[in-house]
């Protein structure tokens, strides 16, 4: 028996076996040969060989692909069909007297070396008339080994992503289980016993939002004598006079507010917080980035949790000032909502570790100092300190129902830069902290596994790029093998990977907006595409972190956008203009245009939703980056003149 060297163009060989009604009468074998997309194969030689005797029957499939062996002796037969361009099809069939046997067989054929080698056997080009709708069998061919390599790589990567998909399902399950377990303070501070709080405002070139931030912080509802405000400014532009003037204005009104300017930016944000902590007098440290606008009752909502001396940090949920400004800001809001609703809630309420998000959180001073203080060997100083503090035994509280509004980036390059910094920082923290976490005998296995998935999740970015590159070769394999033969593997993998993402965002939006969440559902395809759009910048971040490449803390530009009509930000300073990455994204856009065409041309329609997610993601990222960059450059030049 000749073993097929490889799976290639799949033929569905459907055989209807009819045994003789009586033992005395010979049996017959009837069947049809059908190409995997439904075209019947004519002119193929079919041989039936009796395994118990030298008896051999031979026939040829007719114009409609059917064949018949009449007067066949009962017994065990091997059916063989073989011709140019088709791998030898072999199957065993048992023909018994007094029984009518039916069997379905699937046969594999090799891809022809000539495009027309199989074409002539398709009945539609001969007896049925007309031309073969698919043209030649395939204009794109791979050799045997390439097929195997691509399939192993493809399903291997999808398998890894599916593991993270299972983890995502677990987060959703934990959220649904614990979402009603709202944390309560151990007790409450009496008004006369309220502790002193220091509010730190780290700034770097925030000329458009610095004054807004300072104005909102001085209006916090807390005894003025117990509130210290530090403006920690590393700026090198007009932010310096703007921020210092705002500080002087409120200092003259009797507020305990001070302005601290550094010229060297040593340690970036972590360095500024570290320097400010040494000069602060508060027992508790509340931190806000420049894009936040805290509500007056912000401190009151968090301070009472510190009546429990084991609590080291209280984190509040982020909400969004400009979520409805554009498609980009809406998608960002949905992505951040899922993190703060699903991830932070599930981790905090099931006894696991979770991290301070860098802003809108309050720290106990001792928790910072006893855990080693602010360190700046990673770009995620907030996550780094969070893990060190929790390993020291400090407990954290997450307040899902208490939110602090913030401005979302409205520019694509700024958004990608922000996500790159976050991705690189988390991987750096993983390299630094995961060995300590796994060696700690006090931590249960579930906590260790939780932190492994949390700190390695960004490794998916380079894997998704590899999937993007091999999408077309995989389509060729699908075409030549038949889609449904691989579909058995696709269904469970896609259920765990792709469907888990949809469930993840759906549950978070439904929780936050129970009456209007359906309005967000139309954005889910764009959310998934945005995840694809970030793969290049995030993959670079991951690789840099893994090989130890150091980079500065690149701030995310903020422009003070709060309403739909505000387009003045397009000509403001800080407008990032990057050309190399959008050009790569354009190249991949063209690649996926061709891949989509190939899928349509080959009738592999079931893959189109996934291909369109890639296409939309890369196209949107590239076009927005280039268009916004050119508009910003033109307006900036006009303003400069």
Predicted segments, located by residue:
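Structural motif
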Residues: 30-41
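Short Pro-Gly-centered beta-turn/loop motif in secreted/extracellular proteins
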Residues: 39-42, 68-76, 84
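Short, acidic Ser/Thr/Gly-rich low-complexity loop/linker segments typical of extracellular
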Residues: 50-66, 70
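A short, solvent-exposed loop/turn motif at the edges and junctions
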Residues: 51-54, 80-92
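N-terminal signal-anchor transmembrane helix
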Residues: 171-226
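Membrane-embedded multi-pass helical conduit in multi-pass membrane proteins
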Residues: 175-182, 188-191, 457-552, 558, ...
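Acidic donor-binding segment of Leloir-type glycosyltransferases
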Residues: 218-260, 265
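Long helical/loop segments within the catalytic core of UDP-sugar-dependent glycosyltransferases
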Residues: 247-284, 296-379, 390-391, 412-456
């Amino acid at each position: 028996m000749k073993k097929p060297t490889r799976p290639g163009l799949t033929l569905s060989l459907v055989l209807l076996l009819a045994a003789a009604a009586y033992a005395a009468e010979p049996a017959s074998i009837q069947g049809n040969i059908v190409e995997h997309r439904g075209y019947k194969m004519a002119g193929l030689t079919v041989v039936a060989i009796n395994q118990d005797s030298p008896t051999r029957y031979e026939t040829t499939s007719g114009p409609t692909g059917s064949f018949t062996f009449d007067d066949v002796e009962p017994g065990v037969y091997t059916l063989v069909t073989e011709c140019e361009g088709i791998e030898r099809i072999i199957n065993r069939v048992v023909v018994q007297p007094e029984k009518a046997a039916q069997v379905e067989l699937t046969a594999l054929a090799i891809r022809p070396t000539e495009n027309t080698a199989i074409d002539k056997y398709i009945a539609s080009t001969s007896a049925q008339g007309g031309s073969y709708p698919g043209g030649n069998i395939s204009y794109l061919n791979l050799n045997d080994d390439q097929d195997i390599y691509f399939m192993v790589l493809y399903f291997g990567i999808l398998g890894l992503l599916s593991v993270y998909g299972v983890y995502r399902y677990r987060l959703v399950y934990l959220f649904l289980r614990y979402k009603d377990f709202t944390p309560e303070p151990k007790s409450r501070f009496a008004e006369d016993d309220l502790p002193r709080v220091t509010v730190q405002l780290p700034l770097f070139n925030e000329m458009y939002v610095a004054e807004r931030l300072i104005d909102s912080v001085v209006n916090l509802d807390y005894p003025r004598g117990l509130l210290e405000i530090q403006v920690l400014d590393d700026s090198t532009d007009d932010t310096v006079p703007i921020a210092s003037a705002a500080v002087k204005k409120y200092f003259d009104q009797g507020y305990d507010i001070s302005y601290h300017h550094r010229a060297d930016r040593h340690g970036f944000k972590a360095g500024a917080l570290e320097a400010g902590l040494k000069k602060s007098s508060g027992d508790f440290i509340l931190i806000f980035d420049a894009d936040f606008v805290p509500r007056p009752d912000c401190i009151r909502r968090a301070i009472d949790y510190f009546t429990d001396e084991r609590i080291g940090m209280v984190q509040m949920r982020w909400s969004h000032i400009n979520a409805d400004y554009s498609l980009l800001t809406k998608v960002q809001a949905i992505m951040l909502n899922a993190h703060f609703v699903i991830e932070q809630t599930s981790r905090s309420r099931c006894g696991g570790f979770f991290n301070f998000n860098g802003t809108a959180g309050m720290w106990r001073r001792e928790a910072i100092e006893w855990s080693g203080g602010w360190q700046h060997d990673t770009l995620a100083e907030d996550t780094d300190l969070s893990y060190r503090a929790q390993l020291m035994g400090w407990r954290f509280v997450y307040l899902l129902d208490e939110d602090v509004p913030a401005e979302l980036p409205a520019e694509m390059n700024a958004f990608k830069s922000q996500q790159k910094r976050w991705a690189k920082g988390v991987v750096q923290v993983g390299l630094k902290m995961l060995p300590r976490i796994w060696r700690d005998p006090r931590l249960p296995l579930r906590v260790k596994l939780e932190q492994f998935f949390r700190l390695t999740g960004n490794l998916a970015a380079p894997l998704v790029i590899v999937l993007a590159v091999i999408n077309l070769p995989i389509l060729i394999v699908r075409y030549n093998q038949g889609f449904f033969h691989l579909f058995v593997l696709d269904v469970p993998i896609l259920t765990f990977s792709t469907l888990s993402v949809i469930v993840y965002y759906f549950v978070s939006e439904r929780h936050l907006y129970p009456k209007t969440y359906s309005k967000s559902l139309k954005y889910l395809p764009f959310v998934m595409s945005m995840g694809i759009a970030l793969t290049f910048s995030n993959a670079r971040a991951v690789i840099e972190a893994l090989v130890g490449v150091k980079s500065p803390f690149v701030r995310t530009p903020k422009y003070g956008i709060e309403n739909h009509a505000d387009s003045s930000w397009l000509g403001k300073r800080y407008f990032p203009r990057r050309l190399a990455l959008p050009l790569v994204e354009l190249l991949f856009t063209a690649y996926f245009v061709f891949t989509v065409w190939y899928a349509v041309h080959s009738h592999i329609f079931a893959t189109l939703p996934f291909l369109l997610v890639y296409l939309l993601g890369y196209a949107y990222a590239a076009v927005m980056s280039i268009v916004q960059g050119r508009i910003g450059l033109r307006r900036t030049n006009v303003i400069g003149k």
